[in-house]
Regions:
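Non-transmembrane, aqueous-exposed alpha-helical and coiled segments at domain scale
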Residues: 2-125
Length: 125
């Protein structure tokens, strides 16, 4: 006899990406990493942050990691706007990797910044 596990396991990032098909697993992992780092930079205690604050944290992380190639990397993963960050956040909320406050909406991620401006135009060649 074998014991059956009653608890349902969370889907991993690869499973979420395969099911949704808009974003790569790397995109989902990046947003998750960015949330953790953004919260740590703001406070020592875990707390809620806004969609705009998360987008700014993700922008900084992308520039730190990839510099002038940040837009290319993000676009390759399916992320083309700050709204896409929100789409990933809400996918992760749906799959219990993140949580949201009652006041949070997808609109919090609309047009926080323009990718061309912050990832491409700021670098002079």
């Amino acid at each position: 006899m074998q014991a059956r596990h009653i608890l349902k396991m969370k889907k991993n990032f690869e499973q979420i990406a395969k099911e949704d098909a808009r974003f790569s697993p790397s995109a989902i992992r990046f947003v998750y990493e960015g949330l953790s780092l953004t919260v740590k930079k703001i406070t020592v205690e875990p707390r809620h942050i806004s969609g705009q604050t998360l987008c700014e944290g993700l922008r900084k992380l992308a520039v730190e990691k990839w510099g002038r190639m940040a837009m290319v990397v993000l676009n390759n993963w399916g992320i083309k706007t700050t709204r896409d960050f929100g789409e990933i956040v809400y996918l992760m909320i749906k799959h219990k990797w993140m949580s949201a406050a009652e006041t949070d909406t997808m609109d919090d991620f609309n047009d926080v910044f323009d990718f061309q401006t912050v990832f491409k135009d700021r670098f002079e060649f």
